[in-house]
Every structure is written in structure tokens, then in C-alpha cells.
Amino acid sequence: MALELAVDWRIDNILEAIILMLPAMIANATPVVAGGRRPVDMGVVLPDGRRLLGDGKTIEGLLAGFAAGSAAGVLAALASGNMLLAVHSPAIALGALAGDMAGSFVKRRLGIERGRPAPLLDQLDFYLGALAVSIALGYTWTPRVAVEAAAAVLLLHLAANITAYLLGLKKVPW
């Protein structure tokens, strides 16, 4: 008799989506608090004369975001009973951080300076990175929930940024 393992990795409600994206949201927010001095791009300037990413993406922030996002995933796994999230959360956290760096790359190529707004890109780049990683891990999302989760992440991101600005952790509220 063969042992069959049935795992439902379908994300079909907003609560599941928020729980799965918690490591991404924490990973994305942590570098703001962690700060850092050593830029991830090591000062590389591309042929367009602009930095690859800029001083806002630091090694310290990347490591802190990865650690905090991974830890948040373990806590979310314990709270939700989805122990697989504890295993997947480091990858989801890295996906979020990669998405955020991709957003910075795009902003630099468009000539948007560090700290200047790029509506939607600033709020959803990390979500798209984490979403891509979750799909690569085998999670399936209903289109409705993916859009609802994007809207929820957008609102949570805006609220977190305004709060960080009011607390003096960020220079701008976006």
C-alpha cells in the first residue's frame, strides 16, 4: 500500500493569502528599521550613468529582512497550523526582497531618484516577487484572491509607510 500525501496548496481566500504573504511583508518592512551602510550594489554604476540599485538597498537591510521574514513565517506557521509555511517562508522572504530590489532597479533606469515616489511600483514590487516565488513553490492562486491580496498588501503597505514616517523612521510617507 503506497502512502499518498495530499497537500492543498491552493490559495483561495484572503486570509490564507495574508498569512502566506506575512513573511514577505515583514521582510519588506524590516530594512527600513535595520538601515545599513553597505549597499548591495557595491556602488556599481551602469552605462546609463545611474547606480544599479542605489544606497537604499543595503546588505544589512537585506540580511535583517531575510531573518525577520523567515521568523515571521515560523510564527505564522505555528499560529495557522500550516507548518509548510515555516519551510517556505525563507524563500518567500527572499522573493519579496528580490522584488523590492527589482523595483529599485526599474526606478533607477527610469531616472526616479531614491526616495521619490513611483506609485504602485513602490507598494507592489515586493508582493510580485513573493507571489512569483510562492507559485514556483507550487502554490496556486485564484485570480480573485491574487488581486484581493494585492489590494490588501497595497493598503497595509501605505499604512505602514505613513506610520514609519510619523515615527521618524522614514523621510517620506511613501
From Swiss-Prot:
Q: Which GO terms describe its biological process?
A: glycerophospholipid biosynthetic process
GO MF terms, alphabetically ordered = CDP-2,3-bis-(O-geranylgeranyl)-sn-glycerol synthase activity
> One GO CC term of this entry?
plasma membrane
Could you tell me which InterPro entries the record lists for this protein?
CarS, CarS_archaea
| Sorted UniProt keywords | Cell membrane, Lipid biosynthesis, Lipid metabolism, Magnesium, Membrane, Phospholipid biosynthesis, Phospholipid metabolism, Transferase, Transmembrane, Transmembrane helix
Reactions accelerated catalytically: 2,3-bis-O-(geranylgeranyl)-sn-glycerol 1-phosphate + CTP + H(+) = CDP-2,3-bis-O-(geranylgeranyl)-sn-glycerol + diphosphate
User: Can you say where in the cell this protein is located?
Assistant: Cell membrane
Query: Is the keyword Transmembrane in the record?
Result: yes
Q: Which family does it belong to?
A: Belongs to the CDP-archaeol synthase family.
Its protein name is: CDP-archaeol synthase
